[in-house]
Every structure is written in C-alpha cells, then in structure tokens.
Curated annotation (Swiss-Prot):
Organism: Bos taurus (Bovine)
Summary of the tissues where the protein is detected: Expressed in trachea, nasoepithelial tissue and in salivary tissue.
Location(s) in or outside the cell: Secreted
Protein name per its UniProtKB record: BPI fold-containing family B member 1
PANTHER family: BPI FOLD-CONTAINING FAMILY B MEMBER 1
Length: 473
C-alpha cells in the first residue's frame, strides 16, 4: 500500500497552481437586459396584460376625477350624456430594459397603445380616441435582514411626458367640440390607471420571472452516485448585466454534503458578457469536483492476462529486464490494481485544459498473493475536452501520460521506476483511460441554459473557469 507521507511532495507540486485563488463566485449566471426583457414580456403575456388594458375603466376614472374638481357638476352634465365608453383595442409595445446612470439599477419601460370609443345620444357616430402612455418601473437589488438580497421591481408609474390623447378620425365641428371636452376630462385618468391597473400586473409578471430564475438554479445535477446542487446567494446588477451569484454543494449517495463551495471575500470578480445574451461561469474548483465525482470508482482490479493478454506479456517482458525471477512469478492470474490517490487537479489555460492525477499502481504475481511485487506512485496527466452532446455537458480525456513514476515499495528490491515508463503508460491507457471516459461520457445536464430558451451553446475556457455561452450562428 502507499503511505500518505510519500505523496506529500507530489501534492505540493500539484497544489502549486492553487496559490493566488480567485475571488470569483463558484458559479455565476449572467444575463443581458435583452434576456430580462424577453422573460418579462413573456410573463406579462402569461398574465394577459392585453386583457387588463382592454378592461380599463376609463369612464369610471373620468367620473372619479371630475368629482374632485370645482366644476364637478358641469362635468357630470357632460358625462351623463355618454351612453358608453370602452376600450376597443389595446396593445403593449416592445419593452425596454436599460441601465440607469448609477449602473446598479435597470429602468423598465412599457409603451401602451389604447383605442377607446364612446357614443352620445345626439350622434350616431362612435368617437374613437387614441391613448398613448408609457409605464415605467425600476429593477434593483434589495437587501433585507440577514443580508438576504433579492431583485425587486418598484417605483412603478407612468413616464412623465409620455401621455398623448388624440382623435383617431376627423369629426364634424360640433362633435369635435364635445370630443375635445371628453379628452380634457380623460387626460388625467391614464396615469392613475397605469398605477392602479397595470402596475400590479407588471409586478406580478416580474415576481414570476424572478421565481423562474431562482428555480433554474435549484435543479440538482446528477454525478453518478453523487449530485451537485447550486444555491442562490445574491443578485448583482452591473450596468446592463444581471448576475446571479451561486454557491454549490456536493452531496454523496447518502445525501450528506461532502464539499461546500462559497464566495471568498467581499469584492467579487464578475464576468463580462462580451455581447452574448447569457454566460454561465463555473469556477475551476467546482469543475474539478464534478470531474472527480464522475470518475470516482475506488480501486480497479483487473486479471491482466485474461483481459489484456498482450499487455500482460509486455509487462512480463518489462519486469524481466529488472528481475527475471520476479517476471517468472507472473502467472495467468496476475492482477493489476489501480486507484486514484487524490482528487484530480484541473489546469486551465485559454482554450486548453489538462487534468493531473496521482495514481497508485500495484502489481500482484497471482490472485492468491496478499502483497504486491511492487507499488508505483504515478503523476499522470491527460488533456481534457469539453463538449455538448444531446443537451449534456460531456467531458473526455484524450490520452493519459505517466509524467513521473515513483517506486513506493517493492518486494523485488529497489529499481529505477523509469524502466517501467512505457508499460505503465500502456496499462493506464488500456485500463484506466477507458474506465474514466466511460464515466465521464454520462455528462451533466445543462437544463439551466435549456430552460432559458437557448438550444445551442458554446463552451470555452479561461484560466479560472469553464464558460458556457450561446453558440454563434
């Protein structure tokens, strides 16, 4: 067996790249204002905002407004001649979501277009009025007790100077005079109706959107016998980008937390979108935990002569160079045992990734032996690829290399382990590599991105993270 102290210097070598850890959050989902706009527009549609506009109580609002004025009786005398007044058509234009100057708030604007008709007994013509008004509200981050932060929508009202009420068609002189009086009575009503009728719908749609964003982050990711769960920590608005800061927890098969990923420090290093609608940034240590959970298998035990007879023959020849007697002991039931000594380490560069593993390799002459002929400690590395297949984020090791080999213990005397470099690489390539790739191929679902409505995605690497964005067309 391998002794922990023997690997101390190996761990030091692999851990050197961890010096100067980043202050980036474990996972960040970054959304552009375009995504926020589309999601909010869909939620308003779900709440049937058009029907709300069509049901606007214009006549009631005019009556309430007139009762407050000094000419109330005169106004009422005009209004009582209106047989009916209702919205005949209504629509909400394209939403606008833009950052405010402070870079920490977003302004939402919703242009409303309403056609209202009314009729009076003296005229058979239906008079149609065109009402244009714009609703606006502010999206910002609200921090409550226990530092709990959330996105909220507030200060909903009409945009100053956006109200326009006009005749839709030309009218006779007398009818136009009446229509002008109705317009003057109607003008104060739309801003108040925006606040009383539309703002509640806008807030309800926003709450639905916020809830959907939170639900996106709560879907657990299965990693063979383990699973990864993301935890919403806080939102951050940075000019035209909304960042959802996420922590992560790794659970074992018994549901116990085995690893916790948190935000380190108060100053966050947040990603930029670079003209993409969204960006999912997964910190390096989280990616390492995912890979480790996928490939974790304990110890591999292989009857080498039975499974890989040619490799068994090459092993016998390689050992014969060191000790002919030991080579002669290798029988048809010779066993190779392979196990990973530590969690793999991920080394990222722009566009490239490499995984380093510490591996213990034991060679037993027969299946009856309790002690190995020798034990090797191997510093192995593999180039790793990330790609998307059938909605899954898939990892794959291209090859495996025995970069350094150390003799841990030996029953055949001390020898230079470099003599076994070729056969060691052969064994790892033939046994460990397909085993690990088979487990990595199960992949992890990228449902968070799929549920946002993005069907094609692209993967890239930085020195600190794996990045998921929309694929370029």
């Amino acid at each position: 067996m391998a002794y922990p102290w023997t690997f101390t210097f190996l761990c030091g070598l692999l851990a050197a790249n961890l010096v100067g850890a980043t202050l980036s959050p474990p996972v960040v989902l970054s959304l552009s204002t375009e995504v926020i706009k589309q999601m909010l527009a869909q939620k308003l549609k779900n709440h049937d905002v058009t029907n709300t506009l069509q049901q606007l109580p214009l006549l009631t609002a005019m009556e309430e407004e007139s009762s407050r004025g000094i000419f109330g009786n005169l106004v009422k005398s005009i209004l009582k001649h209106i047989l009916w007044m209702k919205v005949t058509s209504a629509s909400i234009g394209q939403l606008q979501v833009q950052p405010l100057a402070n870079g920490r708030q977003l302004m939402v604007k919703a242009p409303l277009d309403v056609v209202a008709g009314f009729n009076v007994p003296l005229f058979k013509t239906v008079v149609e009025l065109h009402v244009e008004v714009e609703a606006q509200a502010i999206i910002h981050v609200e921090t409550r007790e226990k530092d709990h932060a959330r996105l909220v929508l507030s200060e909903c009202s009409n945009t100053g100077g956006s109200l326009r009420v006009s005749l839709l068609h030309k009218l006779s002189f007398l009818l136009k005079c009446l229509a002008d009086k109705v317009i003057s009575l109607l003008t104060p009503a739309p801003p108040k109706l925006v606040k009383s009728e539309l703002c509640p719908v806008l807030k309800a749609g926003f709450e639905d959107m916020r809830g959907e964003l939170l639900n996106l982050t709560k879907v657990p990711m299965s990693l063979n016998s383990e699973h990864l769960k993301l935890d919403f920590i806080s939102p951050v608005i940075d000019h035209s980008v909304v960042h959802l800061i996420l922590g992560a927890r790794l659970f074992n098969s018994e549901g116990k937390v085995t690893k916790l990923f948190n935000v380190a420090g108060d100053s966050l290093n947040l990603p930029t979108l670079n003209q993409t609608p969204f960006r999912l940034t997964v910190r390096k240590d989280v990616v390492v935990a995912i890979i480790a959970a996928l490939i974790h298998s304990g110890k591999l035990t292989v009857l080498l002569d039975y499974v890989l007879p040619e490799v068994a023959r090459q092993l016998r020849s390689s050992i014969k160079v060191i000790d002919e007697t030991a080579a002669a002991q290798l029988g048809p039931t010779q066993i190779v045992k392979i196990m990973s000594q530590t969690t793999p380490m991920l080394i990222l560069d722009q566009g490239n990734a490499k995984v380093a593993q510490l591996i213990v390799l034991e060679i037993f002459a027969t299946d009856k032996d309790s002690r190995p002929l020798f034990t090797l400690g191997i510093e192995a590395s593999s180039d790793i690829q990330f790609y998307v297949e059938d909605g899954l984020l898939v990892f794959s090791f291209n090859e495996i290399r025995a970069d350094r080999i150390h003799l841990m213990n030996s029953d055949i005397g001390v020898f230079n382990p470099k003599l076994l470099n070729n056969i060691t690489t052969k064994i790892l390539t033939s046994i460990l590599l397909p085993n690990e790739n088979g487990k990595l191929r199960s992949g992890i679902p990228v449902s968070m991105v799929k549920n946002l409505g993005f069907k094609s995605i692209s993967l890239s690497l930085t020195k600190e993270a794996l990045v998921v964005t929309q694929a370029s067309s």
